[in-house]
């Protein structure tokens, strides 16, 4: 019995030792069988170390995203430098813009208005030469006066035209009412002779009465939006005066067109910033199918520029030029 029991124990011990040995050698055999190429004898019973270090060019990026080859690092550095330069230029332009605005406002408001107590003008954008008349200017000019004078001038010119005398007769009468035609529509506007800019007029807030509507910073300054012409000759003259020169002592520019009755000496609006030219456009009906349209300018008296007749004939609208000031 004892011999049989000893044999069983020895058999169990040998089996256990063989299983432990198999567990130790199994990963080695698997690595030998699965690895291609010769096996390094230094790492038969261990794993070879991983010598791959961190790539400095991909410290914050994934190396798999880099498909540019050896030049990818240099290209990335170049793009970063170019981006930084663009940001510096943008920042410089932005700072220069605000410094310029601060300088202009400081000179216009702080120096001219507050310190020297003078008027200052800040141009903002180009303005149209054509402007509508406000109520104050319309009352001062007298729209009714333009209506009466233009009607008399138009009737005088039409009564002398051969076509009007033959087809409508003299005195000229409305075909439907058999009365002298009246002005049905009249539009009046002003036009500047020089290019204009829209800007801000700044003045000290001294409490004086004024005809304009102002925005105020009490006891400091006031401002309003207006437009002013760009007179090159006046600008050069102002610059020369600041330098101690006077152009009128050397020469004087005389434009033959700018005489009485032309742009420069047209109807001047009192206390306004510049001279303007007053234009008007009127309509008079001669019948259901006939319409007189005339255009002219006003300076104490009416000067006609054009008179047209619009008439419907055979379903078509025909225009006749009856008068044109050459």
From Swiss-Prot:
Keyword Transit peptide assigned: yes
Residues making up the signal peptide according to the UniProt record: none
Residue interval of the organelle targeting sequence: 1-40
Annotated membrane topology: Single-pass membrane protein
Location of this chain's protein in the cell: Mitochondrion membrane
Keywords: Membrane, Mitochondrion, Transit peptide, Transmembrane, Transmembrane helix
KW Transferase (keyword) present: no
Ranges of compositional bias, category Polar residues: 48-65
Transmembrane segments: 93-115
Chain positions covered by the region annotation Disordered: 47-75
GO CC annotations on file: mitochondrial membrane
Primary localization: mitochondrion
Assigned protein family: Belongs to the AIM39 family.
Name of this protein: Altered inheritance of mitochondria protein 39, mitochondrial
Organism annotation: Zygosaccharomyces rouxii (strain ATCC 2623 / CBS 732 / NBRC 1130 / NCYC 568 / NRRL Y-229)
